[in-house]
Structure formats: structure tokens, C-alpha cells
Amino acid sequence: MLQLRSLDLPIDPLAANANLDTMIDGRYYSQIYRRVMWLLQDESFGLGLDRRTPAGSFRMLCLFIIHCETLEQALRRAAEFINYCRTLTDAPSSYRRPVERLSDGTALYRFPENTDLVGASDINSASTTIAQTMAIWRRFCQWLIGKPLDLIAVHLQADAPARLGYFEQLFGCEVHFGSEHNAFLLAEYCLDCPLIHTEESLQKFLRNAPYHLLVSQEDDDSSL
């Protein structure tokens, strides 16, 4: 409790009369998140993933890709980093071919399989968790290239849930369930977008994380 009160928030969520439904600024939420992440030593963004993400992993991933020239290079290098990290556990990753340019001017960006993200018994019930993981990664890609990453469609392995509208609002495009892969379908030229950031701007981004990964942009109605 002392850890939370030391953040000097505009409200005290631990007070007896606190209204837990009160909206707070995303930057205050980010402060709370960073403190909880430090206490738990887990950077999984509170998504309920099957495995803990050790503190510092996201920073190392960012440093690993920040000097890539294009988004495609960054996506491929990020997959290498994720695969390497998973070899340190007892669960080898099936995340082997992240980017595929198709013959019709589009491309697929594949995410890890459902069983790499959540427990085998939770695959269909965790469709929201998987979708939010993908949405956060999309926002990170948008930060890397400095502009929106427009999607043609999103593919999810999980069966269709009852709340289809939530997923369409989250991504702003068609969402297909029961697919072979968890993937983004996007225009091929998006892969050639240059990365615009440096290690200096990355450090500022990390100081404010996860703010830019959770809060919608002005023209985006897909807040998590």
C-alpha cells in the first residue's frame, strides 16, 4: 500500500470510500502499472498470459530492433528475440515464420500460436487476451514507424465469441475467427515503412510505457 501511495496520484484507490470505477488519466495508469510491474517482476501487461515476462524483457527487445531500417526487418528480428527467450523455458516456440509477402500485394504478419500465449485449456475463452496482445503490438509498430498501421483483416485461431463488435472496434477492420494462424493481413508496402526512432527517443518511450501502447490516438476508437 505504501508503494502505491508514494506515486502521489490524484485519487487514493485504497481509501475506504474510493470509487473504483473512477476514470483516471492514462499517464497515472502507466505509473501504477510500472510500479506493479516492478513489484511482480512481470512485464506481461496484465493480460493473463500463460507465462511470466521477466522485467527488462521489453526494453531488451526494443534495443534489439530499434536500429532496423524497415518495419519488416524489425518484425523478423523481434521474432528472433522472442524465440530465443522461449528457448530459455521448457516451451519451444512455434513462432517460426512471422512475415510472408503474398502475391496479391498483401502480406501476413503472424503472431505466436494460441498455445504459446495461453494455456491449452483456455484457448477459446482467452480470445480477448490474444486479441489485446495483438492490438498492443500493433500500437508498438505504429510508434516505430510514426504513423497508423492500417489493417485489411485480422485472423484469430479462437472460435468466434459472443462480443464480435468489440473485436471489430479494437482493430477497425474485419476479424476472422477459427483461422489457421493469429495474424494481421496488411498491405505489402507497410513492411517497407522506415523506422523513425533512435535510442534517445526510445528511452523516452520506455519511461512513459505502457502509456502509448494502451491509449488510443485522436483518430482511433480502439482503447483497450
Segments from the language model and where they lie:
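A short, structural micro-pattern
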Residues: S103, P148, F177-E180
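Short hinge/gating elements
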Residues: R59-I65, D116-I123, D192, Y211
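Conserved helix-adjacent loop modules within structured domains
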Residues: A107-A162
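Generic solvent-exposed, charged/amphipathic alpha-helical segments
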Residues: M37, A79, M134-R138, Q142, ...
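Extended mid-to-C-terminal alpha-helical interaction segments
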Residues: P161-A162, Y166-L224
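N-terminal low-complexity or simple alpha-helical regulatory segments
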Residues: M1-R110, T129
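Short, well-ordered alpha-helical segments
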Residues: E72, R76, S127-A135, E200, ...
